[in-house]
Amino acid sequence: EWAPVDLAVEAGNLAKMPVIVDFGGNNPPLSIEELFMKHLRKGDIYTHTYTLLEGNVRETVVDTATNKVKSFIWDAKKRGIIFDVGYGGASFNFTQAIPSLKAGFFPNTISTDLHTGSMNASMKDQLSVMSKFLLMGMPLPEVIRASTWAPAQVIQHEELGNLSVGGIADIAILNLREGDFG
């Protein structure tokens, strides 16, 4: 059952790159604790961190009985596993995100997982996902970092995601406004 993950990690070793794992769909679900502690390396990426899929096809980061982040999730983060949002169409659930953020468990990277099935749902674009994390209590500097510099570092392209002399210019000027916009 672990062969696809192990082969991906082996390819990552050969390429000297992290792997990103979209994990789930096994019946019964494989353990994410085992994934983090026995299969992934420091710097490997776990996406769809805050998902809660129907049918119990993927283990969650928050224990649904206690509403607390599972202890091994904290251990995995300390070990260097990168936790990515990967918002997508069905890959994000506030019942996982809110308790996580309240406990101080912020994602390392914020991404959209934009595809034809997700672009016309609650996730429109990167800024809408960033706004949700800001509103859930993630500090603005951390939201910006998790959307720019942190992903560039994770994928080993430090010429991206920052403002520096000689850096690649990809700049957005944002205005933080309060109000009712829905």
Language-model features, listed with the residues they occupy:
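Histidine/acidic residue-rich metal-binding segments in metalloenzymes
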Residues: 1-83, 91-108
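C-terminal amphipathic alpha-helical segment
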Residues: 82, 88, 134-135
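His/Asp/Glu-enriched, well-ordered alpha-helical/loop segment
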Residues: 93-176
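Short, Lys/Arg- and Gly-enriched loop/turn segments at beta-strand edges
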Residues: 178-182
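Active-site metal-binding loops of divalent metal-dependent hydrolases
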Residues: 51, 88, 114
